[in-house]
């Protein structure tokens, strides 16, 4: 099973950007641990980060013929991007929305998601563990849908 992991804007700054909120792990450290977890679960991951909405949309569209599911931390695009929502709906792949911080304990504008109502699940607030929980959930979802 192949899973695309998408990291949105500013996630390339993990480790140095507001470590009290997002933790000290870098994105490359999170991706490396996620790859190890995926191997243990029998999944293959492709990880991609961009600060550009169109690049994320391109990856989602490409995933339609190459992937079985998507994990997405769209960052600020979660609250603004109809384009990412439309791309996710167009490819018809299951996806999990995730966030490092608890978006519901933050500013009001972060409480709204353009993705959550179409996601298989939403995980937030556990720091880097949010990624690992999202992967576990996606693998379980894909396995149960194959029965």
Swiss-Prot record:
Residues of the site described as Transition state stabilizer: 17
Enzyme class: lyase
Residues that coordinate or bind substrate: 73, 79, 86, 100-101, 110
UniProt keywords, alphabetically: Amino-acid biosynthesis, Aromatic amino acid biosynthesis, Lyase
Highest taxon of the lineage: Bacteria
One Gene Ontology MF term: 3-dehydroquinate dehydratase activity
UniProt keyword Amino-acid biosynthesis, yes or no: yes
Amino-acid biosynthesis in keyword set: yes
Reaction catalysed by this enzyme: 3-dehydroquinate = 3-dehydroshikimate + H2O
Classification via CDD domains: DHQase_II
Active site (catalytic residues): 22 (proton acceptor), 99 (proton donor)
EC number(s) reported in the record: 4.2.1.10
Residue stretches spanning the membrane: none
Pathway named in the protein's UniProt entry: Metabolic intermediate biosynthesis; chorismate biosynthesis; chorismate from D-erythrose 4-phosphate and phosphoenolpyruvate: step 3/7
BP term (GO), one: amino acid biosynthetic process
Database matches in Pfam families: DHquinase_II (PF01220)
PROSITE patterns reported in the protein's UniProt record: DEHYDROQUINASE_II
Family: Belongs to the type-II 3-dehydroquinase family.
Subunit structure: Homododecamer.
Function per UniProt: Catalyzes a trans-dehydration via an enolate intermediate.
Name of this chain's protein: 3-dehydroquinate dehydratase
Record organism: Synechococcus sp. (strain RCC307)
Gene: aroQ
């Amino acid at each position: 099973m192949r899973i695309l992991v998408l990291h949105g804007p500013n996630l390339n700054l993990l480790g140095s950007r507001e470590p009290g909120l997002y933790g000290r792990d870098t994105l490359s450290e999170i991706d490396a641990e996620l790859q190890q977890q995926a191997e243990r679960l029998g999944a293959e991951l492709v990880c991609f980060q961009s600060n550009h909405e169109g690049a994320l949309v391109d990856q989602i569209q490409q995933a339609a013929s190459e992937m079985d599911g998507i994990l997405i931390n769209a960052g600020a695009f979660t609250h603004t991007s109809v384009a990412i929502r439309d791309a996710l709906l167009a490819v018809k792949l299951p996806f999990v929305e995730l966030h490092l911080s608890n978006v519901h304990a933050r500013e009001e504008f972060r409480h709204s998601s353009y993705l959550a109502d179409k996601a298989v699940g939403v995980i937030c607030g556990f720091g880097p563990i949010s990624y690992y929980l999202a992967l576990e959930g996606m693998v379980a979802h894909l396995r149960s849908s194959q029965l």
